[in-house]
Every structure is written in structure tokens, then in C-alpha cells.
Amino acid sequence: MATLMIIWGVAIVAYCLFWAWYVGFGSKVSEQDLNRYMACVEQTELSEESVASFRNFFANDDGKEFFMVNLLRLKEPKNESRQLLNKYTSIFVGKLIKRAGHPYFVGLAQARNIENLNCEVVDGWTRTALMRYRSRKDLGELLVDTFRSEHHGFKLAALEKTFAFPASAILNIGSVRSLVGLVIALIAAVTHIVLVN
């Protein structure tokens, strides 16, 4: 019985620690944070509309995770652009993972637009990427760290055009929280069986 309690106690503690890191505690963007993030954003070459979107997104923080939907079109020659983008990605994703974010889906375009209804004609995408962020505050800190950095220059040099917008999940059948919970439970169950038998 004592062994059983220790095994499952450790499993519960491990998952709680993971949850605290991966989900966080709902820390929201403060007014001071907002001013710091926007001071950085306003130094870029983004349009006034994009800058306003950033401000609105940060100002209405709900403290929850979100996903950034990205569409990318590489410059020619694509091999050279792909290498530059990979350099940027390796650095950026490393910083993202430290803040409990990660790539959720990355894919290559298999055709030109199949549907384009009542919107500007934007076509010829090379790839798409869905990136998970723990919070808007994490995005802000990453922006401060990334804008005007050398690795951000790799991204700008690689892309002919890009399109991105944040989204919150209303249906997510591939939750990392559930996966990690199942893995920890499986390890605990196997450990219990091995030690008891």
C-alpha cells in the first residue's frame, strides 16, 4: 500500500508541476507590460492597422492560451529562403518552448487556394504553421526579445509575404495536457505492476 501511494503520489505531483508550467496561473498583460510591448511593436514597419490589432489583443488579455495561425510564402530561390527560415525557427522555437509554447502543426501547401470568398486575392502560400502560446504575456515577451534581433532578420529575408492571426480553441482533440497526463499515468501504472509483482 505504501509503495502504491508513493508511486501515484509522485505521478500526481509530476503532473501538477507540468500543469503549473504549461498552463501557468493566468498572468495577464499589465499596463506597464502593454506600454513596453507596444513601444517595441511601434518601432517596426507594421501597418497602423496591425499595430492597432496588437494593442487591442494585449489590452483585452484573458490570461489563457491561444494559437497563432501563420501562412508563409518563401522568396525565390526557395532553398536559400528555407535555410534562412530554418535558422530563425530553430532559435525562436527554442525561446518559445522555454515559455511552454510550441509548434502545434506545420504543413506544406499542396495546391493554390481552393476557396477565396469575398477577400483580397492572396495566394501561392508555401507552408502553414500553428503555434501554441501559453499566454499573451508570453507573446509580448517574445516580441521584445525577437524584434530587430539577428534571427528575426533571417525571417524577414526568407519571406515574400506572411499572414498571421491569433485564435483560441473551441475544439481541440489533440491536447498536450491530456497526452502528458496519460503518459504519466501509464508510467506510474507500469512502475506499480513491476514493483508489486
Residue ranges and their predicted role:
Residues 151-167:
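Conserved short beta-strand edge segments in small beta-sheet-based binding/regulatory domains
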Residues 123-139:
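Hydrophobic alpha-helical transmembrane segments
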Residues 80, 134-151:
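Short amphipathic alpha-helices within nucleic acid-binding modules
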Residues 2-125, 168-197:
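Short S/T/G/P-rich N-terminal loop/turn motif that feeds into the first structured element of a domain
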